[in-house]
Amino acid sequence: MVGEDPCAPSAPHDFVNSFTHPLGRATESVLRCGHHSKLKGVLGEGNVAHTAMSGNGTTADDDPLQTAVWRLRSRACWVDAAALIEPDTPQASLQRTALLVERCLYTEQGWEEAEDALRTAEAQARTDDERGAAACERGQLAYAATLLHVRDRADEARAALGRAAALIAPGAPGRALLDFRRGVLAENLARSPQAARAAYRRAHAGATAHDDLLLQSFTWRHLAGLALRDGELAEARHGFAESLRIREELGYLVGTAPALVALADTESEPEASRLREEAGRLFRLLGGVPTWLSRQLAPPPAATA
């Protein structure tokens, strides 16, 4: 699935210049989050993707609400995006929950709001797919709390994702996202790279089958991370480059800086430093989000005599 690297950048990547389409009037009327004043006039997109779930599926229809939600989400404005969604149906409640859960993972804030939204989604779920999707979000919220050392909820995460696996049929649209999340749990909590790789490959196949480009950007990146750990530099570079390419094409701003940093880890100087500088610039434009990226962007300690 990964091999030679036809996508590795040979010329400077300019993440600002890659967003060339101006913001539409309808979008400017709803983009009022704290980051928007910094980004207006710098970044924009035309027909961008939107997703109903966290990392689960992208489409490019003309639904103004979903386009606005996507644009806010991509700029790290999850609260503003969630405020546009009335939780009056199971699907709407699940989408709102997914946004607030993603906010927790990227900002280390908003845990109570995400939990409240999740309880609403769980109460409204009627079908196996809806109950499975809610369980998947519970697993993700518990995983994020554990990973970020808010509270150890590893057992809850495993149980919730296991419950989701019993409810979401193989081949269903939500199964690829579930497989991916089981992969990150295996990699980062269980410390089982073999199980993680198998889960990521299932997720990648499912994301490809359902034309889920955003999820593919995550599976490419995590498979590349495992390849880098194994010393497979060319394979890792290819995967990281694919992840970055997809995120730039979709306009997924909040995920672009991490993708730049990951690719930098496979490059030699001066390219590695240039990629990290671009990542730092975007990180600052987004108000220091994702918070955990600050540790990777920090300059190395000065050498002492």
Please report, for each region that a protein language model flagged, where it lies by residue.
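Residue signature of alpha-solenoid helical repeat architecture, marking inter-repeat boundaries
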Residues: 59, 94, 129, 134-136, ...
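Residue register of alpha-helical TPR repeats
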Residues: 63, 91, 95-98, 133, ...
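"A position-specific structural signal for the A-helix of alpha-solenoid helical repeats
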Residues: 67, 95, 99-102, 137, ...
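Short coil/turn connectors between adjacent alpha-helices in alpha-solenoid helical repeat scaffolds
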Residues: 70-74, 100-116, 142-158, 186-196, ...
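Short coil/turn linkers that connect adjacent helices within long alpha-helical scaffolds
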Residues: 88-90, 125, 166-172, 205-213, ...
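TPR/Sel1-like alpha-solenoid repeat signature
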Residues: 178-186, 199, 216-227, 239, ...
